[in-house]
Curated annotation (Swiss-Prot):
Its EC number is 2.1.2.10. This is Aminomethyltransferase. Pfam families: GCV_T, GCV_T_C. It comes from the Bacteria. The gene is gcvT. It comes from Synechococcus sp. (strain WH7803). It catalyses: N(6)-[(R)-S(8)-aminomethyldihydrolipoyl]-L-lysyl-[protein] + (6S)-5,6,7,8-tetrahydrofolate = N(6)-[(R)-dihydrolipoyl]-L-lysyl-[protein] + (6R)-5,10-methylene-5,6,7,8-tetrahydrofolate + NH4(+). The lineage of its organism: Bacteria, Bacillati, Cyanobacteriota, Cyanophyceae, Synechococcales. PANTHER family: AMINOMETHYLTRANSFERASE, AMINOMETHYLTRANSFERASE, MITOCHONDRIAL.
């Protein structure tokens, strides 16, 4: 199967990116090296090409009410210029995908129309787009691809906001987390959508730009000493922050309560949404398993699917695992029975035929200062 390439593919290659297949795309797994890139984001600033992600615009007279029928999070808690994290559900209460919803407010006053921007995972983008369109188009909403041939960048790390402030002259420290605005950046042809969001556990912004503006900004930031980063560092950074990866830490057979995302489920709101009845039953009974954080003794790495052991028997399975460059420890996420999900619980992980000791710990493993 032919792999998609982002508009930054050639620049990633010339910058030293080692390209690998990922979710139907050819993406850089690393540039200078995973640990160097990871450390740059934790201590300074790193730049990611995330143009493989899906970006949809939902537009009409009531986009928030319409999308509310698909997500369990009360979208009316956010207003124009704000955003929230949520999940799409199936009728069984399982997670179809996770997403971020950005409220653009009224975008066509003559028609009384408002708009939302929705960012979805690359691996789910085609299915999500088809399903969302199928559900919302009959309600009079227009669902379109907002990204087109544009570019999505993530600038992350303690210096990220200062870098953008130098280019925009805007105090981005005054922009709340999960807020967004349009920015005029020096040397670019049109305003840039800028959100104070990210997937690294650090402060930073995510930017949606026109193709040539995105290429221009990538070159300028890299020339100015910003470290280009690949999927490898993105994965270790998000794991230290205990941020979920769809398809590994949650899937269509996982409820938000099992995944530790019960805070996204607002059953107190009157709205009916896909999967509500199943989640009401799940809330009453409580989950039989939970996603936990593990720290392992020793340097062996727990990989996806490795058995979690208790009293000599398999009790669960690893979903994500890695060596933590920041903590200098082996860390992992795993599903275990609720009775074993207590902080301090001693467990084991079977790695290449040997059981390595592990302890349930609080998540996230790392929280930025």
């Amino acid at each position: 199967m032919d792999l998609h390439r982002t508009p930054l593919h050639d620049l990633c290659v010339t910058t030293g990116g080692r390209m690998v297949p990922f979710a139907g795309w050819e993406m850089p797994v690393q540039f200078s090296g995973l640990v160097a890139e990871h450390t740059a984001v934790r201590q300074r600033v790193g730049l990611f090409d995330i143009s493989h992600m899906g970006v949809l615009r939902i537009e009409g007279s009531n986009p928030k009410d319409a999308l509310q029928t698909l997500v369990p999070t009360d979208l009316h808690r956010i207003g124009p210029g704000q955003a929230c994290y949520s999940v799409l559900l199936n009728e069984s209460g399982g997670i179809r995908d996770d997403l971020i919803v950005y409220d653009l407010g009224q975008t066509n006053s003559d028609q009384g129309e408002a708009s939302l921007i929705v960012v979805i995972n690359a691996a789910c983008a085609a299915a999500d787009t088809a399903w969302i369109s199928e559900q919302l188009t009959p309600q009079g909403l227009k669902v379109t691809d907002e990204k087109g041939d544009g570019i999505l960048l993530a600038l992350q790390g303690p210096e990220a906001l200062a870098r953008m402030e130098q280019l925009s002259g805007v105090d981005l420290h005054a922009l709340p987390r999960f807020a967004h605005r349009m920015l005029d950046l020096t040397g670019l042809s049109r305003p840039v959508f800028c959100a104070r969001t990210g997937y690294t556990g650090e402060d930073g912004v995510e930017l949606l730009l026109a193709r040539e503006d995105g290429r221009n900004l990538w070159n300028r930031l890299v020339a100015d000493g910003v470290t280009p980063c690949g999927l490898g560092a993105r994965d270790t950074l998000r794991l230290e922050a205990a941020m979920h990866l769809y398809g590994q830490d949650m899937d269509a057979d996982t409820t938000p309560f099992e995944a530790g995302l019960g805070w996204l489920v607002h059953l107190e709101m009157p709205s009916t949404f896909t999967g509500r009845a199943a989640l009401e039953r799940a809330a009453d009974s409580g989950p039989s398993r939970r996603l936990v954080g593990l720290k392992l003794k020793g340097r062996a790495i727990a990989r996806h699917g490795y058995p979690v052991i208790h009293n000599g028997e398999q009790a669960g399975a690893i979903t994500s695992g890695s060596w933590s460059p920041t903590l200098q420890e082996a860390i992992a996420l795993a599903y275990v029975p609720t009775a074993l999900a207590k902080v301090g619980q001693e467990l084991g992980v079977e790695i290449r035929g040997q059981v390595q000791a592990a302890t349930v710990v609080r998540r996230p493993f790392y929280r930025h200062p």
